[in-house]
Amino acid sequence: MSAGVFWWWFFLCAVGGLNILAWSLSAGYLRRRRAVLCAEEYASRRLQLLLSAGYVFGCAFRSVMPVYDVGRVCLFDSWLCSVIIGRSVATFAELCFAAQWALLLRDISRATGSGVGRVTAKVMVPLIAVAEMCSWYSVLTTSNLGHVVEESIWALSAGLLVTSLLWIWPRCSASLRPLLAAWCAAGIAYVAFMFLIDVPMYWSRWLADEASGRHYLSITQGLLDVSGRWVVSHSWDVWKNEIAWMSLYFSVAVWLSIALVHAPVLARGVTDSKPRR
C-alpha cells in the first residue's frame, strides 16, 4: 500500500472510531436529559438518535472498507469489500440521513404551523429512495445516466428543504434564525455545487461513453459483477479522485447527523421546572 493511501485510510478509520464514540456520548447525553423532556420531544430525539446510528455506523463500515463502486475497486481482498455490500450499506445509511432531515423539518413545521414544511417532510424520503434506485442502476449497468438523475434528485431535495426553511423563517423565534440561516446557506451552496459541478460531470461522462460506443451491462449482469468481482488497488492514482469526497462525507456529514439529534429547534418540549414524572 502506498504511503499516501495508507495515511488516508488510517485517517478514515480514526474518524470512523471517533464518530462512533461521539454518537455514544450523544446517546448518553440524551438519556440524561430524558427527565427534562416531554414524552413527545424525547420520542422525536430518540428516533433521531436511532436514524443517526444507521448513518454513523454505516459510514464507519465504509471508512474501514472503502470501495470505488463504478470501478469495482477496493483496498482489501474480501467479500466485505464487494460493491453489493458497500452499496447496500450506503443505501441504508443515506436513507437514514434523509429521514433525519425529514423528521427535523416535520417537527419544525408542526411547531410553526407550516403546511409547506409538512408536505416537504413527507416527500423527502421517497425522493431519496428514487435517487438510490438510480444510483443502483448506474452501479449495476456502469451507465452514468443514472448518476445524473440521482444527483439531480439530491439537489432538488436540498432545494425543497431550503425553500421550506425560508418559508418557515418569519414564524421562527429570533434566537433560532442564525441556525436557520446557516442551514439555508449550506443548502444553497450544496445545490449550486450539485447543479454546477457534480451533475454536469456525470452528464459529460455519459456523453463521452455514448460517443465511444461503450457497452453497458444489463441489470442481471451487473448484479453478478458487483457480487463476485472486486479489484484490489493500493495506488494513489486510482484513489486520488475519491479521497476528497470520501474524507468529507465520512467526517463532516456524520458530525452533522449526530448534531441533528440535539438541534435547538427541537427544544420546544423542554421544561426548566420540575422533572417529568
Please state what every model-predicted region is.
Residues L140-P170, A174:
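Extracellular-loop-to-transmembrane junctions of the mid-late helices
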Residues W23-R33, S63-V70, R87-A121, A129-V139, ...:
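Internal transmembrane alpha-helix with an interfacial aromatic "cap," most often the third helix
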